[in-house]
Amino acid sequence: IGDDPIDQINYMADIGFTAFEDNGMRSRSVSLQEKISNTLLKRGMKMGVFVAHKIYWDKPNLSSGDIDMRNEFLNDIKNSIEVAKRVNAKWMTVVPGKLDFRRDMSYQTSNVIETLKRASDILEPHDLVMVLEPLNFRDHPGLFLTESPQAFQICKAVDSPSCKILFDIYHQQIQEGNLI
């Protein structure tokens, strides 16, 4: 199959898949995004999620309260609207980044909620949804968002149809266990 995303999509369609996730969609060229969109349409597949922003794996961003980090994130969200329209996506993944070990968790949570409220205001008019993805601490140590109850609390506080949870069973079985 190789590295060509068009070949990969065709293979997925051939074996029965009906949707496609591409975390790196934002970094693909506009022409490739359009080719992907056309291929998905032709093959009767839907575009699943793509990552809507730069994820900081090594330093706090959304949890930090840093205005420049917030503005960068919101700009990424704005730019992702065009990507979503281009590839017929409704859902985009958001990972709030690293914990700030020098800051109380309640303040970090407030910072994340405030930023996501602003992002929701940007997404709602376009009927787009960011999905918060809790990632397990074993594979991604030090991240802010690790558990589904935490994601639920944040989404309830954001209170927007544009803020939901991506419940990745792989991560949640490792992190929370006993899911059955």
State the predicted function of each range.
Residues 63-164, 174:
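Active-site acidic/histidine proton-transfer and metal-coordination neighborhood
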Residues 1, 20-22, 47-52, 92-94, ...:
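Hydrophobic faces of well-ordered beta-strands that scaffold small-molecule active sites
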Residues 9-14, 29-51, 79-88, 120-125, ...:
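Acidic (Asp/Glu)-rich catalytic clusters
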